[in-house]
Amino acid sequence: MQRSPYTPGSIAPVVYGREALLRDARRDLAFMKEFPELKGRLEIFVGSRGVGKTSLLRTIENDARSLGFDTCWITSGDGPFLSALVEALDTLSRDWQDAAREQLARVLRNLSVTVGGVKFTGASDAEPREVSSLGRVVQQTLQKAAEGTTSPGLVLLIDEIQAADADGLRALAYAWQHLQSEAPGLPLMTFCAGLTHSQDVITDAVSFAERFRYRQLENLDPEASRAALEEPALARGVHWTPEALDIALTLAAGYPYFLQVIGDEAWKAANYPDPGEVIDAPHVSEANSQFREVQRIFFRSRWMKATPLEQEFMAAMAAEGGAPARRGEIAERMGRTTQSISMVRRSLMDKGLID
């Protein structure tokens, strides 16, 4: 018996179908190691839940570490974004040499995030005073962090960026703008991941968009889907029969999370196969009942997260039968104006229920 190599709901150890994105990220890391300088734009991977954004971000983090970079992981949404940034940088600097650690610690001590903005105190411990430019404070913090590392550079990785507060996003954008013109040789880059409407959230927070580059993650194509099922099994000496593979691919329809689910359930149905054994069609047929139950729970949990009005919106969308639904058509089915459903649509996007 062997443990299942499939990881539904967990970080995937191997990311399939994202080779172009990984190739670009690895090239950027290699260039920064050889030619230290600021990566001009923040890279943001966007897509629906379950398409592998966080797994992609973790893979880039591992690649960066393998090249000797310091990395800083931030998950947005659990409190102010800048609080999370301060905490992550503080944790990072604990292994630094005393002088560099104290320089960054001095900046971090001077930065206390409040609901309405940022306050800081000088070395004299005077009363806190409002900072005229939050972006400048974040710029100073990032600059000290990147200068303090003894590695080839610092890589920031920001997950769930659509959940970051507007003040934090605005400060990050302006800080990056300042760094581009004032510290172009700083070895610092940022990769982010977020839901499909992340661009709307960021645009609402800051008027300029040229600091960000958005990369869309879609469902996997047939070749990548096949690899996502076959290769983990082959690594353990187990083969899928062609018929079993075709059935599983049809069930998952290219959705990365469902590929992991059907792979995991088929592995269990095959009784955790040893090297040399196979997963065949009867195993997938047996796995299908549990796969359908996972799907039912998956969709029900999302449906129950929605308010009655949001459920009405999704029902109106579903009337298109899978085709892209226009806002005007949805509003007409709901008997409402296009403007009146804007907040409902945005709420559903914030919850990750629609794209």
Show which residues each predicted segment covers.
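P-loop NTPase nucleotide-binding core
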Residues: E37-A166, L188, R336, M349
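A short, conserved structural fragment
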Residues: M349-D355
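Conserved small helical "lid"/interfacial subdomain of P-loop NTPases
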Residues: L217-A244, I262
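A short, basic N-terminal segment
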Residues: M1-R41, T91, P184
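Sensor-1/coupling segment of RecA-like P-loop NTPase cores
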Residues: V155, A163-V206, Y214
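Short conserved motifs of the RecA-like P-loop NTPase core
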Residues: H239-L251, A325, E329
